[in-house]
Amino acid sequence: RQRQMCIRDRYKVDFSEDKYIALGLRNIHDDQYTNLALILSDQCQHTTKIAVFNDESCTEFRDSKEFGGSIFKQFENSINYLALCNRTVSTIKGVVRTDKQDYPEEAIREALLNALVHRDYSFSGSIIINVNDSKMEFISLGGLLPGLSTEDIRLGVSQPRNKKMSEIFHRLRLIESYGTGIRRIFKLLSLIHISDP
């Protein structure tokens, strides 16, 4: 109940019990909580693992974290930790200082949300995020849905794996639910001259 109040207060969305069936959190037939409710709760068994490496081959650990709890909590903890991993370089020209990060914050946010919302929760493995000095890699279980190609994704074809979860994240204004996330990542990275994410 405390998590429900926190979500309602932070995102201004009503998650009261009379909305559970419509949101896909309870079954209409037996009034039992659904797997989606478990994933969104603090009892969620899935985790997000982030590792920072000293080398290109990602074998020499510099630091690592594993975040559990609800996927909302995992999102918040992961985004905060990734912000620490996102190096900032400052340059001074005359009297003006310019700060530049390795990766746009919005691109990191989109990639993380994509990994959380579209992963296959029938697998028990964790979302894996690998970071080194040259890349930030997001690995989410499940792969592309049958019939979808990477080119479809680049074009903005939207086919959510977890429809009810996508609807909830859309209500929370965390995602657009319109297939724009991947295109936005590519656009943001192209602005800092990363052409093949």
Residue ranges and their predicted role:
Residues 2, 161-166, 170-188:
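Glycine-rich phosphate-binding loop
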Residues 1-4, 8-123, 131, 136, ...:
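Active-site helix-to-loop segments that bind/position phosphate- or nucleotide-bearing substrates
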